[in-house]
Amino acid sequence: MLIILAPSKKQTYPNCPNLVSTCPEFLQEAGQLNQILRAKTEKEIALLMKTSKILTENTLRDIRAFNGSEGRGFPAIFTFKGDAYDGIKAEDWNQEQMFYAQQHLRILSGLYGILRPLDLMQKHRLEMGLKLATHSGTQMYQFWGEKITDTINRQLDKGERCLINLSSTEYSRVIQKKKLDGRMIDIIFRQIKDGRARTIPIYAKRARGAMANFMVQEKIRDSEKLKNFSSEGYRFLPGESSEDSWVFSCTLNKK
């Protein structure tokens, strides 16, 4: 079983525990993409990424600072910040939980393709949904689709052949479902506010991180046990779920 998360635009170089780090599987491909970006002007980067002047300057700085050698950067699970990652308490994981995460948790990435928690990464801004011309086509999905799907298929060999999708639509689209050699379960979080149930993005992101953290803490290997997730008041709704789309909801407290 594997769990997939989307990355975060917010990234910081953290103070990390003394852990043995690993190298991204597609470091060479990350270097190729960075070279494509490096050849672009500031104006082209701004148009491609729809960024402000300051964000464009920061992005260019990261592109120019990128080093494709092994051993560069910081572990992904500690580098990504933001709503989803606020719920991931990797600094509190014990050795067994970190080992589980390294085996079962994956972070999709526009630059690196797919990352394990302890894979070293450098700060970057490259979203999966961008239209970036490469030798594979005009979209990032064409560049990464087969590579990521093949990697997931290979890593699903251990235990239940099930992919738990805690990612966003933009990132999970990269997976070629027809070629996926296993079951993919989409996790949907809804929030009840003013008597109406709907998905509010900021709360959904936080819930994805909290569920990923729950899976690591409990070292879950049976997807059925996910239905016990109850953080922040969420509960599984069997009547609104299907075999491959599981719905959880919570009621937001009035303020």
Swiss-Prot record:
It holds the Pfam family H2O2_YaaD. One of its GO terms (biological process) is response to hydroperoxide. GO terms for cellular component: cytosol. It comes from the Bacteria. Belongs to the UPF0246 family. This is UPF0246 protein DP0358. It comes from Desulfotalea psychrophila (strain LSv54 / DSM 12343).
